[in-house]
């Protein structure tokens, strides 16, 4: 068996590896459209740990495992108390012995890091308070699939230095992941937000190191909406989450109306700009209906590619770990078990016949 690899952060991947995942995603998407997805994970099980619920993450991973011939087991919020009733180490070891992979949507990034530390099977990061790498893989794949300048090119032929991605709104985990994967590929990333909600310097430092390694791209954090001009992608996210409900009023005052994605803002970006949103969206809050439902929006194509991304990531990380037994070995164990059960069946029938005969004899007496 190969050394176990985990998917925790796109920073752990090289540019070449990202392209490999994209190519795999493209093949599997084409196969799904043809109704011909190969069952590469047949009879395999993915444990899905959710510390908070999610529609797209759960449905996409479950559907992906089903299409690939496997099974996804949903461990819902409150059903599995990591590190409470049982240590995280013990839980991880048990899941490693019963399942072929673990996906975790965690409240704290440390949880996923520790899962990966203890696991003997691949761990996939379904979201933490720090990042959302499965979303990032999906998003860049979608950008390159739909931008006119890139959709017909091989990934190595794309001029990433000419691509500008503008993220408007709060410094969410999606913002973090988008900043880091785009700069790793050498794109230009801009985060536009009120100063209080801007990306922290440590995120920018990582982006700058990515730019240095890629030898192209740029990163800018600003409150200046003029920087949306000439954007290829305009991206936004929710302004607050469930655990930030007490801040909702304050956040609305900070973002509305200046940082709403409106038709006027998209016009300022330019007709080439495509709109993206990781969803769920608060319509007419961070984005107007007229934008998310417009021809410039690829938000729902982006959502579909969550399934594409999960298929690609599951195959990329789980398939190399599978013990690929020959048909001869499979036939051997099938025959061995069937022979055992046939013997048990005969023994059961003999006991059943003996008991019936004994009962009939006793009744006659």
Swiss-Prot record:
Record site feature (Important for structural integrity), residues: 29, 145
Subcellular location(s) of the protein: Cytoplasm
InterPro entries cross-referenced by the UniProt entry: Asp/Orn_carbamoyltranf_P-bd, Asp/Orn_carbamoylTrfase, Asp/Orn_carbamoylTrfase_sf, Asp_carbamoyltransf_Asp/Orn-bd, Orn/put_carbamltrans, PtcA
Alphabetized GO MF terms: amino acid binding; ornithine carbamoyltransferase activity; putrescine carbamoyltransferase activity
Annotated binding of carbamoyl phosphate, by residue: 54-58, 105, 132
Gene3D superfamilies cross-referenced by the UniProt entry: Aspartate/ornithine carbamoyltransferase (3.40.50.1370)
UniProt KW Ribosomal protein keyword: no
PROSITE patterns attached to this UniProt entry: CARBAMOYLTRANSFERASE (PS00097)
Pfam families to which the protein is assigned, alphabetical: OTCace, OTCace_N
EC category name: transferase
Residues making up the signal peptide according to the UniProt record: none
Primary residence: cytoplasm
Keywords, comma-separated and alphabetical: Cytoplasm, Polyamine biosynthesis, Transferase
Quaternary assembly: Homotrimer.
Protein known as: Putrescine carbamoyltransferase
Species this protein is from: Mycoplasma capricolum subsp. capricolum (strain California kid / ATCC 27343 / NCTC 10154)
């Amino acid at each position: 068996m190969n050394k176990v690899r985990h998917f925790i952060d796109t920073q752990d991947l090289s540019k070449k590896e990202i392209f490999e995942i994209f190519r795999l995603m493209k093949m599997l998407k084409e196969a799904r459209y043809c109704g011909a997805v190969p069952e590469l994970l047949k009879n395999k099980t993915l444990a899905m740990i959710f510390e908070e619920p999610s529609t797209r993450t759960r449905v996409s991973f479950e559907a992906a495992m089903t299409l690939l011939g496997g099974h996804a087991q949903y461990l819902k919020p409150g059903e599995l108390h990591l590190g409470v009733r049982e240590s995280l180490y013990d839980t991880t070891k048990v899941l490693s012995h019963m399942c072929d992979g673990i996906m975790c949507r965690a409240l704290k990034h440390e949880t996923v890091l520790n899962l990966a530390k203890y696991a003997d099977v691949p761990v996939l990061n379904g979201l933490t308070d720090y990042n959302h790498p499965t979303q990032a893989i999906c998003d860049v794949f979608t950008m390159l699939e739909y931008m006119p300048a890139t959709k017909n090119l091989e990934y190595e032929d794309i001029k990433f230095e000419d691509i500008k991605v503008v993220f408007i709104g709060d410094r969410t985990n999606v913002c973090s992941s988008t900043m880091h994967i785009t700069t790793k590929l050498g794109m230009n990333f801009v985060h536009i937000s009120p100063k209080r909600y801007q990306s922290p310097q440590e995120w920018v430092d990582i982006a700058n190191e990515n730019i240095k390694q890629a030898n192209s791209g740029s990163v800018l954090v600003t409150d200046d909406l003029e920087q949306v001009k000439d954007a290829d992608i305009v991206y936004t996210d929710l302004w607050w989450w469930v655990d930030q409900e007490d801040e909702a009023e304050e956040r609305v005052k900070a973002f509305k109306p200046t940082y709403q994605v409106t038709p006027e803002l998209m016009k300022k970006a330019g007709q080439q700009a495509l709109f993206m949103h990781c969803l769920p969206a608060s319509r007419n809050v961070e984005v107007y209906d007229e934008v998310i439902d417009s021809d410039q929006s690829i938000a729902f194509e982006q959502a579909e590619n969550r399934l594409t991304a999960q298929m690609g990531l599951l195959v990329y990380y789980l398939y190399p770990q599978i013990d690929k037994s020959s048909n001869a070995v499979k036939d051997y164990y099938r025959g061995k078990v069937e022979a055992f059960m046939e013997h048990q069946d005969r023994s059961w029938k003999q006991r059943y016949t003996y008991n019936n005969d004994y009962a009939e004899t006793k009744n006659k007496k």
